[in-house]
Amino acid sequence: MQSIFDRVTVKNLFEVGAHLGHKTRFWNPKMVSYIYGTSNAKTHIVDLQKTVPMLRTALNAISDVAANSGRVLFVGTKMQACDIIKEEATRCGQYYVNLRWPSGMFTNWNTVSKSVKKLVHYEKLLEQEGDVLSKKERLSINRKRERIEKYLGGVRKMGGLPNIIFVIDPKKEHIAVEEAWKLGIPVVAVVDTNCDPSKITYAIPGNDDSLRCIEYYCSLVADAVLVGIESELQRKQSKELDDKADEKAAKVSHSDGQKKGASIRAGTDKAALQKRKVSPKSEKQDNVDAAKLPENKG
């Protein structure tokens, strides 16, 4: 993570414009502790000294989830975010919602799962029976498939609720934040000066409108996921090596035990054999000694 943390600096944040908030009349009072001041244009300035540690904490949380085989969901449906959200989520092998948040995505996950199953069914139908279906039937099925793919294509392989979500503009994505909050799913979000950070688990104070800022945040999050996945892979490989070493040690110990047992048995058998050889002579001598004893005449 150190290489990622090296990119999280006040200088880099300033260069992408992360310090530029909204006009003062649009501010949310709950963001007051993250505001440095006001510009001449009556725009709030974000305190980047606070953003740096909070961003690093958020990236650590995301990396930890990925390192434990968790699912990370990228959420950003505003025009300037949708393409980047999809690109970066795909790059790190995670999931995304980038066009419209399906209401009940989390709280009614069973319905979403059924829609994903329909998508798979339509694809198989077109692939296996496309030649048999009429043109009208193919067009109808394809329209249904495209509609589901458009809104749920980014979560079709998620296989369950995410373990953490990353949100660009929680004010716009308030439904996603509310659903995650109800189900106890941690939320990482970039909070601008007009946002309410009260339901954000890991808030990142900063500009959530600038294209450069969004690219910067999403790139860092995707890299944090990749670091987590790499960490998990290394841990598994290390565990496999340890297991093999333990197995080898157990085999050696078992083999040594067998050899020791065989040696003890051989020694015992030899001692018994010697005892048998000596025993008849001793018995004969006892009989002779008994014959020499004077008879007790009473």
UniProtKB/Swiss-Prot annotation:
Q: Which GO terms describe its cellular component?
A: cytosolic small ribosomal subunit
Q: Give a GO biological-process term.
A: translation
Q: Where is this region: Disordered?
A: 237-298
Residue ranges with Basic and acidic residues bias:
237-259, 280-298
Which regions form coiled coils? Answer: none
* Leader peptide range in chain numbering: none
Q: Does the keyword Cytoplasm apply?
A: no
Q: Which GO terms describe its molecular function?
A: structural constituent of ribosome
Which CDD domains does this one have? RPS2
Sorted keywords for this record are: Ribonucleoprotein, Ribosomal protein
Gene3D superfamilies the record matches: Glucose-6-phosphate isomerase like protein, domain 1, Helix hairpin bin
Superkingdom per UniProt: Bacteria
Q: Name the protein family.
A: Belongs to the universal ribosomal protein uS2 family.
Question: Which NCBIfam families does UniProt cross-reference here?
Answer: rpsB_bact
Q: What is this protein called?
A: Small ribosomal subunit protein uS2
